[in-house]
Amino acid sequence: MTYTLLRPLLFLLDAETAHTLTLDTLGLLQKTGLLPNRTIYCTPVRAMGLDFPNPVGLAAGLDKNGAYISALARLGFGFIEVGTVTPRPQPGNPRPRLFRVPQAEAITNRMGFNNVGIDKLIENVRQADYQGILGINIGKNADTPLQNAIDDYLICLRKAYPYASYVTVNISSPNTKQLRQLQNETELEQLLGALKTEQTRLSDQHGHYTPLAIKIAPDLESAQIEAIASLLLKHRMDAVIATNTTIARDGLEHLPHGDEPGGLSGAPLTERSTAVIRQLAMHLQQAIPIIGAGGIMSSLDAQAKIKAGASLVQVYSGLIYRGPALVSEITSLLCSRSTYAG
């Protein structure tokens, strides 16, 4: 009810200003003890060798710098993913770079991995009092040539490894030039090989295993999805997140901000991302868990992704349009046996 009243006021503001204001307010409420803790009980879901207290996670992008983990943890998520973070701080693309398309319940962003850098993010993670499952989403700096991208991912992996429950490798944002080329078979083969080798070394060094997930785009042909699935199996990756934002604009061109460059999320992405999950599930045959993301605006959207083959789901744009109550709404449905029984 509270968010229903607040949303029209927030939507009067520039989208990025509203985003920052909302997070700052949550952080203040948490620090002053005024933010209630929503504990949502569920049969734990086991994936990546981890026991998730419920299957609904926060997608990367909302808390890029890990500065609001303690506050977001009180909203009832089963896990939280922060980032995308890069080795060095970078400002991202010029503003405005975040746009709502309310008529389509969509958001377009061309943020460009704006973040404070991996060292500061880790400092924030260490200061948070969150004890739950935390994913750290890593990427490459905008000025790093594609041929050196592996180095950026390895730098971030090494620094995140001791503090993350799992690490997500973002190779699918449309807002960093050439990044999506890392999904091509040759480039992905090299990247996954380097990541697994380093993961093994870090596991020996730290005495524990931190899983690796790969986040892919929704704008892939069937043959590309099959090739990616084959490489994920070959390199024994721990999970795949499907999907990131889309560059498609089908039916939105006539709407205000509907044709803004960048990645589109929200309701127009729902079916596209679920279709990718379905194809991945067919190729992976439950050997690697799928985390479903993209256009989850209701509990039924989340259920559709589970039925398509996902083990867990993540939300972001749905929170902007529905508010925090969406988390408990989805969890209530997904925790019923019928969802996982098919």
From Swiss-Prot:
User: Binding residues for substrate, per the UniProt record?
Assistant: K64, N109, R110, M111, G112, F113, N170, N175, N244, T245
Membrane topology qualifier: Peripheral membrane protein
Q: Signal peptide: which range, if any?
A: none
Question: Entry cofactor note text?
Answer: Binds 1 FMN per subunit.
What GO molecular-function term can you cite, just one?
dihydroorotate dehydrogenase (quinone) activity
What's the main place this protein lives? Answer: membrane
Q: Where is the active site?
A: S173
Q: What Pfam families does UniProt report for this protein, alphabetically?
A: DHO_dh (PF01180)
The annotated subunit structure for this chain is:
Monomer.
Name recorded for this polypeptide: Dihydroorotate dehydrogenase (quinone)
- Which species is listed as the source? Nitrosomonas eutropha (strain DSM 101675 / C91 / Nm57)
Upper lineage is: Bacteria, Pseudomonadati, Pseudomonadota, Betaproteobacteria, Nitrosomonadales
Name of the encoding gene: pyrD
